[in-house]
Amino acid sequence: MLNHHGNNYLIVTKSAMVADDEYIKVMDKNKAHIQITVTTLNDDFCSTYEKASKPSERIKAILKLQEAGFDVQIRLSPYIPQFVDLDKLAKTGINRVVVEFLRVNTWIRKWFDIDYSQYTLWQDGFNHLPLEKKLEMLKNITGFKEVTVCEDYSEHYDYWKEHFNPNPNDCCNLSIFTP
């Protein structure tokens, strides 16, 4: 229906099924933008907190869609540096990355044993990292053609728009929506 009416669309998923041949056949490469979320590269660890495709399957799906000519990105959401082997990820051949930093609430504190002391900013029920810490973390994300930040802490949004993201009009850097 979206293809028929000429609408652009964004698919954000943790499922590798989006790269199954039956789905590839119905998506329009000129209209579809796909982001596949990965929080860790460890299949076993991931299964303790996510009911989704294994990260290894998601990586394969991204590469298949990329090879097929789709506008696709890996979405590190949330990005928790202790959980992602960035060197290994950079060697996969994935071109584009969207980073969304962890925002911490009570549920997150119960699930993940990490140091939350640097999450000092508060907004809408969540603790967030200071901008300086986010910039420091981004220095480690290398080896990709494009890195974009998706920000939900309102005081940082303009920074990414004006100084970092390749497309200042679109925080997800969807190439199909670029004028």
List each language-model region with its residue ranges.
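C-terminal accessory extensions appended to soluble enzyme cores
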Residues: 108-179
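Conserved AdoMet/S-adenosylmethionine-binding subsite of the radical SAM
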Residues: 1-137
